[in-house]
Regions:
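Ser/Thr-rich, low-complexity intrinsically disordered terminal regions
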Residues: 20-153
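Sec-dependent bacterial lipoprotein signal peptides
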Residues: 1-21
C-alpha cells in the first residue's frame, strides 16, 4: 500500500511539473511542391495579414553555403513584433522575429522564430517559452504549414 502511494505521488508530481514546464521552440520544416514564387507571394500576404512587417519583401533571393556546397533560397525576415505577453520576473514584453527560408534546390521551407525582450540596450533571447508565449510564437509557423497543406502548395 505504501509503495503504491509513493508511486502514485511520484507520477502525479512528474505530471504537474511537466505541465508547468516551458516548451522548446524548434524551427519548423515544411515540404512544398508548387512554384517557389507562388509560395513566396502567398507567404508575404499571409505574414503581413498576421500583423508582422516584412523587412525585405522586394529583395528576397540569396545564395547560401553549407557543407555540401551552395544553394539558393528565397528569404523573408520580419521586424520585431510585440507579442502582448510579458515576462513575469521582469515585466518586459516579449518581442518576436520570424525568419523564413524557401529553399529552391530541395523544395523545403524552414521557419525560425527568434523571441525575447529588450533589457536596456541588450536583447535577451530565449529557446523555450511558457504556454501562452509558445502559442503566439508558433502561430505563424503553424499557419504557414497549414496553408501549404490546404492549398497544395
Amino acid at each position: 500500500m505504501k509503495i503504491q502511494k509513493t508511486l502514485f505521488l511520484s507520477f502525479f508530481s512528474l505530471f504537474i511539473i511537466s505541465c508547468g514546464a516551458n516548451k522548446i521552440v524548434y524551427p519548423t520544416q515544411i515540404e512544398y511542391t508548387a512554384n517557389p514564387q507562388l509560395i513566396l507571394d502567398e507567404f508575404i500576404a499571409y505574414i503581413e495579414l498576421q500583423g508582422y512587417k516584412i523587412i525585405n519583401a522586394n529583395d528576397t533571393r540569396m545564395t547560401l553555403r553549407n557543407q555540401n556546397g551552395f544553394f539558393t533560397a528565397e528569404y523573408l525576415e520580419t521586424e520585431w513584433f510585440n507579442s502582448g505577453v510579458y515576462d513575469e520576473p521582469t515585466g518586459k514584453e516579449f518581442i518576436i522575429k520570424q525568419k523564413v527560408w524557401i529553399i529552391l534546390d530541395s523544395n523545403q521551407i524552414s521557419v525560425k522564430s527568434v523571441f525575447g525582450y529588450l533589457d536596456g540596450e541588450e536583447m535577451i533571447v530565449f529557446d523555450s517559452a511558457p504556454d501562452e508565449l509558445y502559442r503566439v510564437v508558433n502561430a505563424l509557423p503553424e499557419g504557414l504549414k497549414q496553408m501549404v497543406s490546404s492549398k497544395a502548395l
